[in-house]
Amino acid sequence: MLRVVLLFGAALTAPLRAQEAPPKKVAASVERLFGRGTRVDTIAVDDRRVLRIARGDSLLGFAQVRNVIGRDQPITFLVAIDPANRLKDVDVLVYREPYGGEVAYDTWRKQFRGKGADAPLEIGKDIRSISGATISSRSVTLGVRQALSELTAWHEQGKLK
């Protein structure tokens, strides 16, 4: 019995292996958020990959692909910010759960737009939960808050240019 508990406990604390988003989905998301004709460069910051999006000499913003665990499966999403460190949008790239896919709907995602790192980004405060997708909505909200915080800090520290 102890062995089962130890194995189960290890599964809960093991780090989530990075789930890759299909490159075509990332490219389509960047185009939808920033328009056509953008240049996307990948920057390594603190062992993470950040996308720098520009058109010509103009910086349009930054984006990062992240993963959170929904009820049982990873949810892969892209968080994009503008040069003023405001959330441009959140785009769910891969949703693997059988239920709760409403986190990918624009009607839910649009409540993140324009928020800064100073916003609470908490279910029940400035973000609505989704009935039937409570775990997914909480997980994505937490992941967005963490990504926004990191992207903003890196940008303010000059690690993103």
Language model features: what each stretch is:
Residues 18-138, 142-161:
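Flexible, solvent-exposed loop/hinge segments and secondary-structure transition points
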Residues 9-18:
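Hydrophobic h-region of N-terminal signal peptides that target proteins for export
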Residues 1-7:
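Sec-dependent signal peptide recognition
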